[in-house]
Amino acid sequence: MLLRSAALCRALLARRGRAAGLCRRCVSSLQVANEPVLAFTQGSPERDALQKALKELKGRTEAIPCVVGDEEVWTSDVRYQASPFNHGHKVAKFCYADKALLHRAIGAALAARKEWDLKPVADRAQVFLKAADLLSGPRRAEVLAKTMVGQGKTVIQAEIDAAAELIDFFRFNAKFAMELEGEQPLSVPPSTNSMLYRGLEGFVAAISPFNFTAIGGNLAGAPALMGNVVLWKPSDTAMLASYAVYRILREAGLPPNIIQFVPADGPTFGDTVTSSEHLCGINFTGSVPTFKHLWKQVAQNLDRFRTFPRLAGECGGKNFHFVHRSADVDSVVSGTLRSAFEYGGQKCSACSRLYAPRSLWPQIKGRLLEELGGIKVGNPAEDFGTFFSAVIDAKSFGRIRKWLEHARSSPSLTILAGGHCDDSVGYFVEPCIVETKDPQDPIMKEEIFGPVLAVYVYPDEEYKETLRLVDSTTSYGLTGAVFAQDKDVLREATELLRHAAGNFYINDKSTGSVVGQQPFGGARASGTNDKPGGPHYVLRWTSPQVIKETHGPLGDWRYPYMQ
């Protein structure tokens, strides 16, 4: 519910001295809170609804079109999305947009831009607030089921992603956008100054990943909320859930041409949008090579753009847990198991390297191996006791298997547990822990994006040197955690690891950021660190205009010193 702040509106009116036209832009206070994460216990209404939705998807293939304007477009370039844990089940049949259709989508978006941008932010926000309500209520089970079946997520991983986080993105972004309207420059009589937060001039290309349904909704949704028009290229391996999110936005009142839903071949999409003079932004989550390629394409075409495109990218990480000898072992073990192996290590923030002190390693190792035996890997749609499921596709499976082959063949690496792979039914990889004698081995440096945890054991007295090693080993800077009870060590670690992580955790796991609480993102090779989930992110998708109005004659053109 939008609560109008009459007092603040009156204050703004008095300060600016021009009542006409300002009420439309008066600041609103939107009260929001994080969406509760449902438990899905036996016999609960949410569990019953989810099981019903999963049953409806069993053996079903949904046909998904490109949507340009208000028209569903079916092309001859047909693709399929397979369920990761049962690749014989094609969950979606969709078609790729070619260059001609993408150009048509650009034209349709541009035609709608001016009217959408001129709408008051409160009106645009209502669309996303309604979408959040639909996700929170009648459409929750559908989106969760499609995320589980299509992307291989367990109940809880789907819930914290496709429900809680996406709902939070829509609600908090609406709050941040409306509060931004209240950020106005100082006015000094006889003039009043105001700031208009316009959308960008052109279209934004949103390119989303497979691993979070919420990220796709936010990459397209946040720029649209701020008055922009968007071409959304969803991931081939998240098509089912992405299309559901798009339909919910339309059901919530999003006009037809604001977000164009255009599945496409990656290079075709990239070439087309970066060659358009109207490109004004790219909102991206994916691999470093892809983002670098898009950046280079923008640079090569710089002279043709009407405006400098905004480039926002999140590109993953090689995230760490550093353990000091003063750490609580229970916290280390529980936090590391969750961070490294939830969703099969396919989170951008997943812990992929652990630095353990020699004095604690026997205890930590014993506990990790003991608990690892209780992790169930399987079909999350049929067994709610599954901790994680298959990795996303054959390409990912093959890449992870090569890392495991490296672990078996390298003299500096020892597989302590797990590592078996089986792709006969789904793309299953056992959780694997690898100990290394070489802290510079590639397994400690490069992103794996799978259920593989690399461990380096360091001498206790060399913890400062090891902290420097943590900072310098990889090119990434996304997330990391330090486990210690010694306050001096925590202070030293915070200073030495200042640029090693954009999201830094103390005595907590490296995953699990919450919208509004821990805005997410990192620098270095991890991206542009624009912090979606925080108040500054929406500003990224605006082009502010300052208006000065002087109330009275300007007087003599001559300066006093000239007399």
Curated annotation (Swiss-Prot):
GO terms for molecular function: 1-pyrroline-5-carboxylate dehydrogenase activity. InterPro entries: Ald_DH/histidinol_DH, Ald_DH_C, Ald_DH_CS_CYS, Ald_DH_CS_GLU, Ald_DH_N, Aldehyde_DH_dom, P5CDH/ALDH4A1. GO terms for biological process: proline catabolic process to glutamate. CDD domains: ALDH_F4-17_P5CDH. It is an enzyme of class 1 (oxidoreductase). Keywords: Acetylation, Mitochondrion, NAD, Oxidoreductase, Phosphoprotein, Proline metabolism, Transit peptide. Its main location: mitochondrion. Substrate binds at residue 513. The keyword Mitochondrion applies. The record marks 211 as: Transition state stabilizer. The active site is at 314 (proton acceptor), 348 (nucleophile). GO terms for cellular component: mitochondrial matrix. SUPFAM superfamilies: ALDH-like. The modification N6-succinyllysine is found at residues 93, 99, 114, 130, 175, 347, 395, 509. The modification Phosphoserine is found at residue 44. The keyword Phosphoprotein applies. Irreversible conversion of delta-1-pyrroline-5-carboxylate (P5C), derived either from proline or ornithine, to glutamate. This is a necessary step in the pathway interconnecting the urea and tricarboxylic acid cycles. The preferred substrate is glutamic gamma-semialdehyde, other substrates include succinic, glutaric and adipic semialdehydes. Belongs to the aldehyde dehydrogenase family. This is Delta-1-pyrroline-5-carboxylate dehydrogenase, mitochondrial. The lineage of its organism: Eukaryota, Metazoa, Chordata, Craniata, Vertebrata. The gene is ALDH4A1.
